[in-house]
């Protein structure tokens, strides 16, 4: 895979180093980071179909603009996991939408990185609630992906950056 216009997605539960990895990847590649602005997004009004539609539009926009790579700090897997566990999405419908977006991402040769917790109890304590189920749902989504996938944890972020650089250069 030598994609000069890659989509790189960093996923995982809260408090595992996703944003740190995104910043490291951006520094190493020069690609911008896209992250929802939480001061603008109202999570209680999020709907799985709307989120799916927005994500598919972002993928298409990236393809059309051919503006170089982009790094997403959370994307379709986060919507799937947090949507089911925190926003009452219908599980089967959310799974279908997850697979639909994953198919689009696979066609775009996206790289999906799952940042696993080094210590689930620590991540849960820092978050303020148990994230064990979230971790399991991320694992499910990650295993279902047809994209180029990498798994890492906070202790191996440098190695992950090197792997991504090898994939895109």
Where are these regions (language model features)?
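NTP-dependent small-molecule kinase module
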Residues: 2, 126-169
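Walker A (P-loop) ATP-phosphate-binding motif of ABC ATPase nucleotide-binding domains
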Residues: 7
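Hydrophobic anchor at the beta1->P-loop junction of P-loop NTPases
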Residues: 10
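Conserved substrate/cofactor phosphate-moiety recognition/catalytic segment
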Residues: 13-16, 20-69
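Short, solvent-exposed loop/turn segments at secondary-structure junctions
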Residues: 14-16, 76-78, 117-120, 155-157
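Conserved P-loop NTPase "ATPase switch" module shared by AAA+ and STAND
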Residues: 68-80
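Conserved phosphate-donor/acceptor-positioning beta-strand/loop module used by diverse small-molecule
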Residues: 73-75, 93-123
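A mobile, often basic/glycine-rich helix-loop segment
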Residues: 80-98
């Amino acid at each position: 895979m030598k994609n000069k216009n890659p989509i790189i997605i960093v996923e995982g539960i809260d408090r595992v180093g996703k944003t740190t990895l995104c910043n490291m990847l951006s520094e190493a590649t020069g690609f911008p980071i896209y992250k929802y602005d939480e001061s603008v997004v109202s999570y209680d009004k999020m709907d799985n179909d709307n989120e799916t539609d927005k994500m598919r539009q972002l993928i298409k926009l990236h393809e059309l603009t051919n503006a170089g790579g982009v790094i997403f700090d959370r994307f379709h897997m986060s919507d799937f996991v947090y949507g089911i566990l925190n926003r009452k999405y219908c599980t089967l419908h959310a799974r279908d939408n997850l697979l639909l977006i994953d198919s689009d991402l696979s066609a775009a040769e996206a790289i999906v990185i799952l940042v696993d917790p080094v210590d689930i109890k620590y991540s849960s304590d820092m978050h303020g609630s148990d994230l064990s189920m979230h971790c399991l749902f991320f694992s499910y989504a990650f295993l279902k992906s047809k994209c180029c996938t990498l798994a890492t944890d906070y202790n191996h972020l440098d190695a992950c950056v090197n792997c991504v650089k090898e994939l895109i250069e």
